[in-house]
Amino acid sequence: MNIHEYQGKDILRKFGVAVPRGIVAYSPEEAKQAAEQLFDELGCPVVVIKAQIHAGGRGKAGGVKLAKSPEESLDIAHQLIGMTLITHQTGPEGKEVRRVLVEEGMNIEKEFYVGITLDRSTSKNVLMVSTEGGMEIEKVAEETPERLLKIQIDPLFGMQGFQAREAAFFLGLKGEQFRNAVNFITALYNAYISIDAALAEINPLVVTKEGKVLALDAKINFDDNALFRHKEFHELRDTNEEDPFEVEASKSNLNYVRLDGNVGCMVNGAGLAMGTMDMIQLAGGKPANFLDVGGSASPQTVEEGFKIILSDKNVKAILVNIFGGIVRCDRVAGGIIEAAKKIDLHLPVIVRLEGTNAPIAQKMLDDSGLNLIAAKGLRDAAQKVQEALAAS
């Protein structure tokens, strides 16, 4: 689960992570009031008005602006709130800005990057720091890897003090700045572990001319599998920032990711789903989604899966690929038949069932009287999808 920048900063602040003072505003008038409050209480020369969407690259897209007065803050908020912001992460459709963060301006001397996430290749959390603040870390890793330090964190002992100091040394900091950076990194790690985050990224981490070390931006992603331990974070979810198909799928506990193709996929198991998508691509098609109905697919989940796939108007054919290990193929076949009778299945549906009770399932489909196209293997299924698309 992703959250907004201001929400992430509120959480980090509770763990002692230094962040600038900021106030969220849902209207231009609220933005003006927030700016007045910051100017009066902090005496800062400028405030920063930042569009709040679940995407990076806001600054380059015009979603981050400076204001020197409450009146200017009002004008900028009028421009931002309600606009569709398009960045390299939003795609061409962009995201609507529904709120802004009004934040005190910083007297920046240096910019860095610091992030903590899970390294799946080593099954350890990894602390990453870079001297290239404000840059995409993937680009830094590819083009100038010498400017990126990765420190593997032992899951038994957690991050040690010497590792935080190593990171601060790598950034070239000294004296008070060094000590502040060590404290910052330590607090960030404690927050990351305590909230069961999948990612805690500060880009940029800034050092001010006064020697302060603060998170100018903050990106927090939660591990969905651990959210049951943090019910206080459920209210932070903003479904307006999520794909509506994915939101609907999550209500039925379906693992769904929308793509930009025209072949709907319903598969049990993530590995088989990815293999199915590859075969569709190799046959000349383009998958419209990733949909894993799970190892215990029931008629209800199959029906919900069909509804979600059919709600995507780009879908021109559907491929159902089920391997019956834990799940019985006849149960899935029953779900397909039931769904087809309830829903207007006006698209060609190619079905490949293998494994437990597959012959029974195939007979059920044959006897159903429905216009379902049977496939004998994955390659055959992908080919029949292409034939169905060509005929439509």
UniProtKB/Swiss-Prot annotation:
Pathway: Carbohydrate metabolism; tricarboxylic acid cycle; succinate from succinyl-CoA (ligase route): step 1/1
EC number: 6.2.1.5
The reaction(s) this protein catalyses: succinate + ATP + CoA = succinyl-CoA + ADP + phosphate; GTP + succinate + CoA = succinyl-CoA + GDP + phosphate
A Pfam short name: ATP-grasp_2
Chain sites annotated for binding ATP: 50, 57-59, 103, 106, 111
GO molecular-function term, one example from the UniProt record: succinate-CoA ligase (GDP-forming) activity
Matching InterPro entries: ATP-grasp, ATP-grasp_succ-CoA_synth-type, ATP_grasp_subdomain_1, Succ-CoA_synthase_bsu_CS, SUCC_ACL_C, Succ_CoA_ligase-like_bsu, Succinyl-CoA_synth-like
Boundaries of every ATP-grasp domain copy: 9-248
Gene Ontology CC annotations of this record: cytosol; succinate-CoA ligase complex
Entry note: cofactor: Binds 1 Mg(2+) ion per subunit.
Residue positions binding substrate: 268, 325-327
Cofactor: Mg(2+)
Superkingdom per UniProt: Bacteria
GO terms classed as biological process: succinyl-CoA metabolic process; tricarboxylic acid cycle
NCBIfam families: PRK00696.1, sucCoAbeta
Binding partners and assembly: Heterotetramer of two alpha and two beta subunits.
Official protein name in the record: Succinate--CoA ligase [ADP-forming] subunit beta
